[in-house]
Structures are given as C-alpha cells and as structure tokens.
Amino acid sequence: MEKVILGKTGLEVSKNGFGALPIQRISKADAVYLLQKAFYNGINYFDTARAYTDSEEKIGAAFEYTRDKIIISTKTAAQTGEDMWKDLEESLRTMKTDYIDIYQFHNPAFCPKPGDESGLYDAALEAKKQGKIRHIGITNHRIAVAKEAIESGLYETLQFPFSYLAADADLEIVEETKKAGMGFIAMKGLSGGLIHNSAAAYAYMAQPQFDHVAPIWGVQRENELDEFLSYQECPPRLDDALMQVIDEDRKQLSGDFCRGCGYCMPCPAGIEINNCARMSLMLRRAPQSGWLSEEWQEKMKKIENCLHCGQCMKKCPYGLNTPELLAKNYEDYKTFLK
C-alpha cells in the first residue's frame, strides 16, 4: 500500500486512513470485523476521538494484541488542562493502550499555546514527556486557527477538511503544512457525503503535490471499506473522465454551502441544522425518497421555529449565514412535496 510520512513525526501511515467516527453507529462485533479487515489488508492508521461515543472502545477491542503494528490518533475537546488529562486517561483505558501516537486538540476555537489560560498545551507537553502521547496535533475547520497552528511551530500534525472542492485558502493551508514539515491529515475527503465518486476523490488526493497528505475515509459498511481497499490494487488515475466528474461537482457545489460538520449543534429550536441546511444538495445528489419521508418533513418543518438567536452563525467555522441558508433550503424542500 502507498504510504505517507506525516511530516516531522516520521510516522509512516497508509494513504488510506480509517476514519472511525462512523463505527459508533454499528455493533461492536461488526466494528471489530471492519477494523481488523482494514488492518489485515494494509491499513495501519486509525483516527478516532473521545467524543465519538464508543469508537475508542471498539478500536481497543480490535487491536489489543496488535497495538504496536498500528498508528492511532485520537482527540480531546477539553477546554482545560485538567479535563484534557481526564480525557487522555479515559482514551488510554478504553483503547487498552499505554500511549497514543498522535493526540489532537479537537477543533478548538483558538490555538492552544504554552502558558495560556487553558493549560491545554502545557498538559499535552507533560503527557508527551511521560510517554503517554508521542506527537501533539490539532484538528480544525477554521482557516485562521489552522494558520496560527502552522505558524506557531508547536504542532506536528494538522487535521483539516480537504477534498477536490477545496478553495484557494484551503489549498494554501495544505501547502504551508508541507513547508513547515507538518503532517497533513485530510478529513472530509468526500465533503460530508456530497461527493459521491470516491475514485475521483482518491485520485485527486494521489496527485504528486499532495504526497504529504494522509486522507482518512469514514467507514461504516464493508462495501465502503472494500471500495477503498480496491484502490490499493488498482489506483484510479485522474483521467479526463474523472476530471469531468470533478469539474461538474465544482460547478454545483461552489460558493456557500453547508459541509455538514455539525459544530453548529445542538440547536435550541431542535433543528437538525447539519442536514437541513444542505437539504437542497442532498435532494439533487442522493435518492430523494428517504429525504422526503414523513420523518424528514417533520424535521424540516422545525425550521419554521427558528429563534434567529445567531448561535449557529457564531459556531459555524465557515462563516455561513445559517438561518438564511435554512430558510432557502426549506422553501426549496417544499417544492418537492407538491
């Protein structure tokens, strides 16, 4: 399998990384099966988070006896050093390990630094000295925080959304991490489900200028895993046909659109923002029947109860006018019900 070296960490990871957020939705037995199948077929990098409910526990069950042969990254959303220690100890316990390869701050609104009020970086540094974590990383959806993390020189890896829908500012982040010797871990390679052609997504990431990029693909079903494993044997190339797919997607998905990251949640009015705010796209890019069910009609109707409190706008890492986006999607949705 093609490998990627994560910058100054020196860690050599499979170009296909296993994103373990979706396995929280399946049984422990099914998750262990998928994880072990991935490992025995050449995938050695698994990414999870303390916030992903039982994902860490399932990783621990799958790799208790092969821990030294895999690379694990996990995340803490803690706001203080004290809480970071609690998260770290719990992650170590649930994954049945005494160290984490890459320990990441999970989408913080600021860039943790030594001596700041949060105490997060100081705690991570101490954990590294104790051997409980080997490398300190950060994940983010915000351009400004990502840039600050790169410029600080404090972080060994950056996990950031990246796909062929990336804007110029996103591409600049990718280039800057390479110059800084940081490992770049690409999340949202399928843009939260809006990209349907995984071959095009994979081929785009496989270009020479992205040789330092390690994409992680969220896997929940065996056929999804098989799809990415097949690219190891027969890597898709960025030919005219795949470029046409990319060009069409870029035309349809340019501008302001919801990536479905969910950082706006929860909504005080009970609106499922991360799906409702991109309903127009989902209706046109996926089978419509599921989105037009009575259940989804009720969920979309909740948009009428929007409080216009502005909480979602403040939380949105992409600076979207979320209430306006919800209203537009709702009006469009109603046209499909006539």
Q: Which residue stretches match the model-derived regions?
A:
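Generic structural signal for well-ordered alpha-helices
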Residues: 3, 35, 56, 60, ...
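Conserved, mostly hydrophobic/aromatic
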Residues: 6, 18, 46, 59, ...
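Structured C-terminal cap/extension of enzyme domains
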Residues: 39, 43-44, 172-186, 190-338
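Short catalytic-loop micro-motif centered on adjacent basic/acidic residues
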Residues: 44-49, 73-74, 134-137, 157-160, ...
